[in-house]
Structures are given as structure tokens and as C-alpha cells.
């Protein structure tokens, strides 16, 4: 497994464990995180394209006023990691 694929898998794990499975996070935000995970898992596209798709989804929800602060921080960290994927 390449370094990029390993990084993508780590990002998927963070989203799954800290956002999707957190019941304190509103449902629409968990759903967007699931969509970002699906975009990252799409092996038909290049890693950079998958990362860009996930960034678009996560940026859209990152300013949601209903998002808990700890979740917003996680989303920002994930966005930073995704932006490094080329």
C-alpha cells in the first residue's frame, strides 16, 4: 500500500471513529462525513481527485452552526490532511 493510500485510510478511520460514530454530532454532519468516506474509498479515481471530492463535501459542512466545537476541530484537521494529498 502506498503512502498516500495509507494516509487516506487514516483519514477515513478518523472520520469514522470521531465523527460518524459520535452520537453528539448532528445527523446531517455525520451523513456528510459518510459521503466524504465514500468519496475517499472510490478506487476508480486518483487519490488527489478523491481527496478533492471529500474536501468539497467537508468544507460545505465545516461552518454549520450546529456542529460541536470538538467536531469542527476534527473536520479542520482532516481538511488539512486532505489538502496535502497530491
Swiss-Prot record:
<comment type="similarity">
    <text>Belongs to the UPF0147 family.</text>
</comment>
<dbReference type="Pfam" id="PF03685">
    <property type="entry name" value="UPF0147"/>
</dbReference>
<dbReference type="InterPro" id="IPR005354">
    <property type="entry name" value="UPF0147"/>
</dbReference>
<dbReference type="InterPro" id="IPR023130">
    <property type="entry name" value="Ta0600-like_sf"/>
</dbReference>
<protein>
    <recommendedName>
        <fullName>UPF0147 protein PYRAB16980</fullName>
    </recommendedName>
</protein>
Amino acid at each position: 500500500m502506498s503512502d498516500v493510500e495509507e494516509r487516506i485510510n487514516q483519514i477515513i478511520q478518523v472520520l469514522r471513529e470521531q465523527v460518524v460514530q459520535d452520537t453528539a454530532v448532528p445527523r446531517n454532519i455525520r451523513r456528510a462525513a459518510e459521503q466524504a468516506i465514500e468519496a475517499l474509498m472510490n478506487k476508480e479515481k486518483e487519490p488527489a481527485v478523491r481527496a478533492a471530492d471529500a474536501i468539497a463535501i467537508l468544507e460545505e459542512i465545516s461552518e454549520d452552526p450546529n456542529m460541536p466545537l470538538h467536531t469542527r476541530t476534527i473536520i479542520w484537521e482532516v481538511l488539512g490532511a486532505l489538502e496535502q494529498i497530491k
